[in-house]
Amino acid sequence: MAEVITVVGGGIIGLTTAFELTERGQRVRVYDPTPGERGTGASYFAGGMLAPIAEVQFQQDALFPLMVSSANAYPSLMRRLAAVTDAPTGYDTTGTLVVAGDRADAAHLRDVSDYYRSLNRSAEAIPVSRARALEPALAPDLAGAALIEGDHQVAPRLFMQALLKALRARGVEFVRERVTDPDFGDIVCTGLGAAGQYPLRPVYGDILRLQAPHPLVEHVVRGLVNERPVYVIPRPGGEVCIGATSREDTRTRPGVDGVYQLLKDAIRVVPAVEECELIESNVGVRPGTPDDLPIFGKRITATGQRQLISNGHFRHGILLAALAGKAGAEVFLGEDIPPEFAPCSPKRFER
């Protein structure tokens, strides 16, 4: 075992993996030009929803166990992180409301709820009147609603800063360099930086941050508006996050069409969004794989070095971070790969 374990990548997966290594008494060095900061990766611009139920999509049966296991791992991670630093993370267990804009959206919500049940999970269908009792800012003419008490959230930027503070307190060294050699490092969590080695594609997502004159909502509100998804996420200090589009073009800046549609749909669900100030519009770039599953597993480099890959978490990097970080540390230190990660082997893309 190396005296110092090298983690390549300082996004949410790299930072949680490094933290879990320090939890096990390991010395760690992290390589990233902008660890936990505004860069070209996905973590800084993520919504931060820990929502295995609301986030699952049709035909994602292999992904769902990962999402559930990681959501279940968050309370332990947050307790252990709080034992090292008192920095805020924005971890919030208030729950999630899913609402439908019209009857077609309500029918889609029922179909999705049936899929949840097929996975032995459920969203509680509630009257719109109850949804508005929970969140008075909701539009009065919504067509349907469901409550998912187990879908939570974290504020990614706060979370990463807390991880950085904890890692520095434990003596982790940060090297602000970009690594381009795929054979460098013990654990590789570089997102799209590994696109030359694995079939990763950039999926862009426009995301907005608003400042509300007063708190708008307490729950995460996910809406379906003409079958388009939109979410309204409350943040500490009256900030609101609205997202997110999903596009596979080459625009690295927010498009007017995407910003317009996000605001229009958010206002349809929570009309008071119209009273907010727009303080940021940006684009996150998610590393997607052909099957939408992460890439997780061992490989041997060209120089014969043992290496662990933890990459390609696509839209679920924040949600999957608790499990990916824990599993990454454990597997690198010699434990078996958790069964949830069995479909995620890098070998499935080997030619």
Regions found by a protein language model. Give the residues of each.
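N-terminal Rossmann-like FAD-binding beta1-loop-alpha1 element of flavoenzymes
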Residues: 3-29
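Short hydrophobic core segments
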Residues: 6-8, 31, 183-192, 325
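Active-site substrate-recognition segment that forms the wall
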Residues: 19-24, 33, 49-50, 87-90, ...
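Glycine-rich FAD pyrophosphate-binding loop
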Residues: 22-44
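Dinucleotide-binding Rossmann-like beta1-alpha1 core, especially the glycine-rich loop
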Residues: 47-130
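Short beta-strand to alpha-helix junction loop
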Residues: 58, 65-68, 99-108, 146-162, ...
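Helical element adjacent to the flavin cofactor pocket in flavoenzyme catalytic cores
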Residues: 144-180, 189
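C-terminal catalytic lobe of FAD-dependent flavoproteins
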Residues: 276-351
